[in-house]
Amino acid sequence: MDNPILNDHNKQEYEPAHTAEHILNQTMVRMFGCERSRNTHVERKKSKLNYDLPVCPTAEQIAEVERRVNEVIEADMPVTMEYVTRDQIPPEVSLAKLPDDASETLRLVRVGDYDICACLGSHVEHTRECGHFRISSTSWTPLVPQTLRTPQPSQPPATGSFRIVFRLDNPSEKY
């Protein structure tokens, strides 16, 4: 697609953490059947994501999330981008968070065959450049009914917000 017209994007994410966020999102979707994070704050020193879940994950599940994210990072998958029109979006890509005024052309970011989503942010070229993913803390906050999002038909209703704070150890020096 020549010279796609995209919405302005004012975020300059730290590439290793932003790619790790995509991997974490897909890991949470696969393990818990939830949507991608409700909100995300990506920074060089630490990043935070919140997920609406029916129950608080156990310590074992949290350790498994960390293990799976590192497994994807270590696989050194390519991170690629492609520009598509809305009618070319694959069915597995959710546009639920897309602003109403989003352009007709969207950029899809793929992390190997593990994840794909619409995104305008900066990324690494290969997952190993992220370094070692470490969950530094988690917290669980029960949600009151008026703050709950309506789940997809295949998802159990959320009862709380699960926050993950993560850091990256030894990311590539080129970022």
Where do the protein language model's features map onto the residues?
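Active-/binding-site microenvironments in catalytic and ligand-binding cores
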Residues: M1-Y175
